[in-house]
């Protein structure tokens, strides 16, 4: 729903964002996502430096009052189809007009101090739609990503911006239409320090310039030259550090009253034998030489000594055979060998289990379990009372005192029956 930008609405915006009620005291104003359809009633905000109008329904920038101090204007995500009305803000430094309906960039020459222009996700297609950029002489950062630019001639327009440093063109067909896109842009715009997704370093610029002048051969020569220069710098740094260390040792020897020298004084007390290392066994040297005669296994790391030995054979002109380290078929992997050993161990275990007889409880064990009271301990009895196991029992004939004998007989009978059942079970199993 559209809303009007009135003084009352602007005052409410100031309240919501903790700004001053007095308009002239504010140097920024957040009017984003308010549904405003036009710019109005900003005359009292004469000291604004940043104005946020993102996410409204503006169709034009007309209505901006003279704001001499305004540096940043954010009007992305609106419905603007034409740039106009910027004459009132000649000191504008940054303009974000992305995600609008622009088909042409214009009306920017009235902002001679404009250094950053962000115009992504619009409808810029032809060279004419961006030709006006040649008049923005102070422009340093230009973002035209995700438009519809496809003519390689845009490079000629960008060349006319003398101080262009950051350029973003990803998301446009022109990136694919320009052969050797990055090299062309780097050599065409000498001031460029950042292109799309990464910086432009000095070495890249030198390589691109060599490619422009000498093609691929010139590029290779420049890469080799840069590599040699880097190695030379590293060598000089190493020599300088060694000289500093030797000078420090000489100074230390002088303070300690030791003879002159370039070595660490702490090593003077060590004998020459402490620096000697045991020689490698002849068997190890011979094995390494044999292995070095074969190429490395694909996908496996090999010891550094083996790689060095193979390089030595190559330098001596000796042949290096293709294939595995050993003779014959390629050796099995460690995982396959381990799996086979596990299967063999499992098979042996299964055979042993089949040969072992079944272990069943004996009758004596069952009798002992029946004699053992519940819980492994006899229940505590009160003084003067008869234990439950020895309490008198009345037989069918009326006699007393024979209950314990009856219980014992019952246990033995149960045990005998259990033993007979176990024997029968064993016989049946033997038949199986």
Swiss-Prot record:
Cilium-specific protein required for cilia structures. Axonemal dynein-associated protein that participates in a structural link between inner and outer row dyneins. Residues 323-332, 407-425 have a biased composition (Low complexity). Its main location: cytoplasm. InterPro entries: Cilia_flagella_integrity (IPR050576), Leu-rich_rpt (IPR001611), LRR_dom_sf (IPR032675). Disulfide bonds: none annotated. LRR repeats lie at residues 47-68, 69-90, 91-112, 113-134, 138-159. This is Leucine-rich repeat-containing protein ODA7. The keyword Flavoprotein does not apply. Residues 212-243 form a coiled coil. Residues 297-332, 368-432 are annotated as: Disordered. Interacts with both outer row and I1 inner row dyneins. It comes from the Eukaryota. The gene is ODA7. It comes from Chlamydomonas reinhardtii (Chlamydomonas smithii). Belongs to the DNAAF1 family. GO terms for cellular component: cell body; cilium; cytoplasm; cytoskeleton.
């Amino acid at each position: 729903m559209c809303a009007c930008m009135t003084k009352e609405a602007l005052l409410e915006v100031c309240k919501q964002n903790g700004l001053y009620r007095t308009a002239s005291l504010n140097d920024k104003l957040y009017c984003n996502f308010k549904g405003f359809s036009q710019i109005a009633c900003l005359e009292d905000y004469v000291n604004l430096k940043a104005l946020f109008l993102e996410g409204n329904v503006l169709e034009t920038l007309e209505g901006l009052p003279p704001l001499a101090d305004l540096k940043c204007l954010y009007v992305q995500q609106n419905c603007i189809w034409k740039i106009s009305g910027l004459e009132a803000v000649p000191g504008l430094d940054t303009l974000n007009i992305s995600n609008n309906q622009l088909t042409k960039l214009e009306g920017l020459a009235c902002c001679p101090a404009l250094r950053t222009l962000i115009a992504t996700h619009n409808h810029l297609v032809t060279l004419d739609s961006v030709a006006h950029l040649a008049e923005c002489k102070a422009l340093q950062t230009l973002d035209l990503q995700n438009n519809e630019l496809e003519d390689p001639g845009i490079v000629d327009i960008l060349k006319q911006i003398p101080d262009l440093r950051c350029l973003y063109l990803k998301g446009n067909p022109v990136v694919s239409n320009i052969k050797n896109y990055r090299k062309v842009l780097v050599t065409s715009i000498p001031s460029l320090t950042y292109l799309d997704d990464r910086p432009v370093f000095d070495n890249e610029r030198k390589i691109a310039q060599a490619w422009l002048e000498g093609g691929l051969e010139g590029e290779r020569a420049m890469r080799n030259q840069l590599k040699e220069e880097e190695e030379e710098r590293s060598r000089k740094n190493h020599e300088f550090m060694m000289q500093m260390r030797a000078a420090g040792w000489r100074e230390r020897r002088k303070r300690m009253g030791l003879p002159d020298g370039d070595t660490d004084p702490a090593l003077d007390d060590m004998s020459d034998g402490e620096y000697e290392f045991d020689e490698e066994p002849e068997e190890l040297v011979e094995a390494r030489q044999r292995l070095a005669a074969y190429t490395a296994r694909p996908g496996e790391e090999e010891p550094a000594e083996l790689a060095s030995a193979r390089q030595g054979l190559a330098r001596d002109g000796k042949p290096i055979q293709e294939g595995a380290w050993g003779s014959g078929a390629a050796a099995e992997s460690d995982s396959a060998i381990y799996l086979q050993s596990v299967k063999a161990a499992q098979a042996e275990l299964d055979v042993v289990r089949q040969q072992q007889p079944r272990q069943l409880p004996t009758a004596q064990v069952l009798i002992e379990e029946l004699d053992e009271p519940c819980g492994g301990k006899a229940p505590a009895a009160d003084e003067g009372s008869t234990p439950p196991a020895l309490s008198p029992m009345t037989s069918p004939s009326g006699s007393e005192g024979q209950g314990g004998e009856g219980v014992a007989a019952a246990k033995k009978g149960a045990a005998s029956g259990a033993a007979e059942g176990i024997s029968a079970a064993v016989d049946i199993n033997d038949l199986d």
